[in-house]
Amino acid sequence: MRFRRLTPGYFRVLQMQVAGELKAEPRSLLAGVVATVLAVLGLGGSCYAVWKMVGQRRVPRAP
């Protein structure tokens, strides 16, 4: 079951899944691994960008 946007019906489906009244569609192991790798790459890229911005602020200014 796929929804194109967040609707009240979609939230009801999520509540039913949490309550155990509705079973979620089975996912492949590969999808979980790919999602984890993408999350780690995204967090790493964000941390690197912040690290570079902080490093630029520490440069002393000439008088």
Curated annotation (Swiss-Prot):
Subcellular location: Membrane
TM region(s), chain numbering: 30-50
Protein name: Transmembrane protein ZNF593OS
Source organism: Homo sapiens
Top-level taxon: Eukaryota
Entry GO terms, CC: membrane
Membrane topology, as annotated: Single-pass membrane protein
Keywords, sorted A to Z: Membrane, Transmembrane, Transmembrane helix
